[in-house]
Amino acid sequence: MVHPVRVGKRTRMSFSRLKEIGHMPNLIEVQLDSYNWFLKEGLQEVFEDINPIQDYTANLNLEFVGYKLDMDNIKYSVEECKERDSTYAAPLKVKVRLLNKETGEVKEQEVFMGDFPLMTEQGTFIINGAERVIVSQLVRSPGVYYDVSVDKTGKNLFSSTVIPNRGAWLEYETDSNNIIYVRIDKTRKLPITILVRAMGHGTDTEITNFFGEDERLKATIEKDNTKTHEEALLEIYKRLRPGEPPTVDSARSLIESLFFDPKRYDLSRVGRYKFNKKLSLHLRIVNQISTGDVVNPETGEILVQKGEKIDREKAVQIQQCGINSVDIEIEDTTLRVIGNNFVNINNFIDFNIDDLNIKESVYYPALKQILDNYSSEESIREQIKKNIHNLIPKHIIRDDIYATVSYELGLAYGVGHTDDIDHLGNRRLRSVGELLQNQFRIGLSRMERVVKERMTIQDQEVITPQALINIRPVAASIKEFFGSSQLSQFMDQTNPLSELTHKRRLSALGPGGLSRERAGFEVRDVHHSHYGRMCPIETPEGPNIGLINSLATYAKVNEYGFIETPYRKVNKKEKIVTNEIVYMTADEEDEYLIGRANEPIDENGKFVDSKITVRDKEDVIVVPAEDVDYMDLSPRQLVSVATAMIPFLENDDASRALMGSNMQRQAVPLLKPQAPVVGTGIEYKAAVDSGVLPKARNAGVVSYVCANEIRVRRDSDGGTDIYRLLKFQRSNQGTCINQRPIVEKGEIVQQGTVLADGPSTDLGEIALGKNIRMGFTTWEGYNYEDAMLISEELVKKDVFTSIHIEEYESEARDTKLGPEEITRDIPNVGEDALKDIDDRGIIKIGAEVRAGDILVGKVTPKGETELTAEERLLRAIFGEKAREVRDTSLRVPHGEAGIIVDVKVFTRKNGDELSPGVNKLVRCYIAQKRKISVGDKMAGRHGNKGVISRVLPEEDMPFLPDGRPLEICLNPLGVPSRMNIGQVLEVHLGWAASELGWHIATPVFDGATEEDIIECLKKAGYREDGKTILYDGRTGEPFNRPVTVGYMYILKLAHLVDDKIHARSTGPYSLVTQQPLGGKAQFGGQRFGEMEVWALEAYGAAHTLQEILTVKSDDVVGRVKTYEAIVKGENIPEPGVPESFKVLIKELQALCLDVKVLNDDNQEIKLKESVDEEIENLDVNIEGNEDFVLSSQDNDYEEPEENDEEDELNLDYDDLTLDDLKDDLKIEDFNDEH
């Protein structure tokens, strides 16, 4: 039944039927944990991999002994970094030891290796003043993968790929003639026996003795034209290095370096773990019949007798005592199964070795050698440490290769299984830490080359570590990663939810991942292993669908990078569901039957029903209660945070829920945030973890509160914690970040208590929109095609008003002709244009500005012109140089206006770091209040989006029997075909809740039912169907049937009409074609494309057409003359030759064709060579800005607004302005159900 739940400072009435068992993990721990791992272990691993660096004579030896991040010498705090456009980083100091073996001299030094970017508490990085997020990447895990294809005759052909983390690939394939081939590193294929011979089994008998008799092996041997180990080596060498003289030694060293050199071939821990899992013996011999006795080699005991079936325990026992091949009987033939000879070390050692940190299986021959030669605990421990790389090899070993071949042979008999590459057991996550580690490794290996060179060149006696090490390549590779990697993205900061989701995003794109074009349907599709790990709902529409995903709410990432999800264990003996929580990866989960979270259970934890619905891989089946192994932890564990915020998700169609999830991320923070009346109960957790709320660091008592500061007196030592609040800061997306205190003086706070509200939060809960009184009714056609009719009350009361802050900057540089100057003294500008400019030439704070107003007065020196004699005389008399400057002031761009809220000035003199050639930098921040207006895009949480079509006076809006007018009317036709019924349930429940004064929590898949809602409506005194008689505001007559009325949570999205509306008469033109530019950003025109020209041709509108193709576009002289004619009120002159025609002629001339243009009388028309020649004689400049091209090149580098990948992410056809689409417009683009 409905019960109160306390969330932060608010109590919600919850309809949840389930007790919360485990808590949701911290939502940004993916980022934080990964970065901490990198600082603690990741960096260390890279240094260990590269140690030691030796010169070519192996005399000098350079080692990295240790490192530390110097946290005390961080130059600027996070806030200062944002202000100064610098990077939030700490110096990395590395201790380096140089050993000269000849003289035995050791030199140790601490070397500075560049500033290393630090992660903020919110899981972001500040790079050049911009907040960025490193997105986790989903990649194929290193390992062995087997696949099957069917040939024309219906025969199964098996193939396999051995994928390392880095190094050469091995690919096996079988053809229709039963011959198995191998490709080494994508070269031409060889019979597989050549590889086996080269590995050491030289003759045919050795091969058959090792792998057992097998038809496919026989066929391959017949095909193979080499007969010995040496011949095979030479054959491989010829294939891999064609054109070089083959010798046995060079072939041997080639193979060594390809596969067995840890510097060239790296499996990584994950790869080794996947190899051992896939190639282990016990998984393939389980439930098979042995053809001979299996004997323990140590004790001589018979583990399995001839003809006995091997059960799971026996199979594990066989592998763990070091047996590596077993013959089994399949369909009257004997098949030899070979493993890769790895065992669990704890079965062989009777003392505790936890401190050695060995979690993987170890290579049995290496272990046996240690145990045979040493007996004391000390010496064994010592040897294990010394030989750790032999016990757990980083590279592939011969036994791995034999095991992969054996697996390939076994597949034909149904032993082993093929793999599904889209299964999350075979895809892993590379989070920040690992991506950084790989990048750091690239930098270090480049540095290693430099060090080796310097070792040989410099004098070995006086050399120091400092002189050897060049930190440039390391610093550059880190900088490159943060600045321009596809996975380092400009943070989406529209609201707290979009920040949180961005940090939890998983991308399959990026370096080493997929590309949009190659990704097929399978990769993008929802897979059964996504359950509880990746959200099946939240993914962008458009070209990236399914390639960019979101982490599910309860998911965690394990040490190998696989995503795990929690389950409750079922005690099968007592048939009780326990509260023990187990995290499982996707391939572990496949072995169990898992019940759903809302399966009815009595108070003792027993199942109520005897038959239970469970998941078994991709099937949902019904089984007896005693067969269930685990149970889901929570009904919302399969969806992401944004999706979990949609109430009644279970009643929405999936594609609409997808739009709902994505649009919540685009909601603009409003002036007065309001938490949803109908929520899901996750709003508090999401806001707290998003990092926009200041939380108490320690328990204590609030001693002081004002608008921008809160002080808390600590209980522990009586000291004071000070929390500064952010006031009206600009976010990455230009929305407003503002924090307001929600605690009072004297209030007792615990550690983690929310002290203040941030943007889009209300009492610590995420509040993206407003609860609006609305009805599903049409009104005079203003609801056509999802449009919304809103009441003027929403405008008057600032219900949907938001603040937007834009940043403009101007820099004074040194030019060839002298320095630019920021000044109030601007040529040809009247005094009234300077009324708000102070004496420095910079606008005053608080001034109201409109488009075209000067923000920063700046003049640039012009080239000195040749002086006339009179001027020289005047100059000689007055000594006054006529100032040759032109006005390059920063002005407010078209369509922008607002109030100056902040001005920041940085100068060289004050010691601010500015880019080279810049003397002074001025930044102005303009804030504007944007009220809701016609053309703004609004949406609910269920994918029900629309554009405002009309603002109606409140007296004309339909009103309720008690006289309250509706605030919004939505079209009822928007509901049935879209199948997002959740919005209707939300409206009904909101209607009842507002009357009862409740805030409600209805968690996804565990929320209010239809009966609950009817119950609430009755309690509130409304009709059971939630409908009401409405009256027409204009006439006072009732409408002819009752209408569904209630409260819906409505968001205002970041697609505001003010940012899209745009007009141009004249403006900038493209340099080559002389046609107007396109798009609002360039102050461009509307393209009149090919199809539009056809339309005019079809009408026969010849003059209009000629005008559009010439004077309105690229007839340089004609357009200026036309402009003058319009200004003077004369007739428009005849068009001339368009520039495109000249370009065409130039291209034909480039093909050596002599082209002449003739008039009616066969006289040649002379074309001017260049645009400049034509413009020389014209005295009017219609480009608006005389140096448009110059000013656009002033800024060599601008922080990209969004990064490229993001740009393509949000291709939402409904919101594209026409000029974004260029001319590949299709009519379907405008159809809502695209």
UniProtKB/Swiss-Prot annotation:
GO terms for cellular component: DNA-directed RNA polymerase complex. The gene is rpoB. The keyword Methyltransferase does not apply. It catalyses: RNA(n) + a ribonucleoside 5'-triphosphate = RNA(n+1) + diphosphate. It holds the Pfam family RNA_pol_Rpb2_2. This is DNA-directed RNA polymerase subunit beta. Its EC number is 2.7.7.6. Residues 1189-1212 are annotated as: Disordered. Keywords: DNA-directed RNA polymerase, Nucleotidyltransferase, Transcription, Transferase. InterPro entries: DNA-dir_RNA_pol_bsu_external_1, DNA-dir_RNA_pol_su2, DNA-dir_RNAP_su2_dom, DNA-dir_RNAP_su2_hyb_sf, RNA_pol_bsu_bac, RNA_pol_bsu_CS, RNA_pol_bsu_protrusion, RNA_pol_Rpb2_2. Belongs to the RNA polymerase beta chain family. GO terms for biological process: DNA-templated transcription. DNA-dependent RNA polymerase catalyzes the transcription of DNA into RNA using the four ribonucleoside triphosphates as substrates.
